[in-house]
């Protein structure tokens, strides 16, 4: 009988998995891969512009 309270506490600590998505997706949701691609693109543009100078006009992307 002493183990019963411990067993109940352990059951309460186990997170239950939802059977359906807790938050439905909307048209505003952006996949994580898209955010990752946008971050990579922004960093690439930053690195390209960092080395840009009047002597290297061909390296400058508008």
Swiss-Prot record:
Q: Which family does it belong to?
A: Belongs to the conotoxin T superfamily.
> Upper lineage ranks?
Eukaryota, Metazoa, Spiralia, Lophotrochozoa, Mollusca
> Which sequence ranges are marked TM in the entry?
none
Q: What does this protein do?
A: Mu-conotoxins block voltage-gated sodium channels (Nav). This toxin inhibits tetrodotoxin(TTX)-sensitive sodium channels, but does not affect TTX-resistant sodium channels. Reduces the amplitude of currents without changing the activation and inactivation kinetics of currents.
For this entry, list what GO says about its biological process: envenomation resulting in negative regulation of voltage-gated sodium channel activity in another organism
A Gene Ontology molecular function term for this protein is:
toxin activity
Predominant subcellular localization, coarse grouping: secreted
Where found?
A: Secreted
Q: List the GO terms this entry assigns under cellular component, sorted alphabetically.
A: extracellular region
Position of the signal peptide: 1-22
The free-text tissue note of the record is: Expressed by the venom duct.
Q: Which domain of life is it from?
A: Eukaryota
- What's in the domain note? The cysteine framework is V (CC-CC).
Which ranges are cleaved off as propeptide? 23-48
Q: What protein name applies here?
A: Mu-conotoxin Lt5d
Q: Any further remarks?
A: Negative results: does not have the ability to interact with the G-protein coupled somatostatin type 3 receptor (SSTR3).
Claim: Secreted is one of the keywords in the record: yes
* Provenance organism: Conus litteratus (Lettered cone)
What InterPro entries is this protein classified in? T-conotoxin (IPR031565)
Q: One Pfam family from the UniProt entry? A: Chi-conotoxin
Record key words, sorted: Cleavage on pair of basic residues, Disulfide bond, Ion channel impairing toxin, Neurotoxin, Secreted, Signal, Toxin, Voltage-gated sodium channel impairing toxin
Q: How is it modified after translation?
A: Contains 2 disulfide bonds that can be either 'C1-C3, C2-C4' or 'C1-C4, C2-C3', since these disulfide connectivities have been observed for conotoxins with cysteine framework V (for examples, see AC P0DQQ7 and AC P81755).
């Amino acid at each position: 009988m002493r183990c019963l309270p411990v067993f109940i506490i352990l059951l309460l600590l186990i997170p239950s998995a939802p059977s359906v998505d807790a938050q439905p997706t909307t048209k505003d949701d952006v996949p994580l891969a898209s955010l990752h691609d946008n971050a990579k693109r922004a960093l690439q543009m930053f690195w390209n512009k960092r080395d840009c100078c009047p002597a290297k006009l061909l390296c400058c992307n508008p």
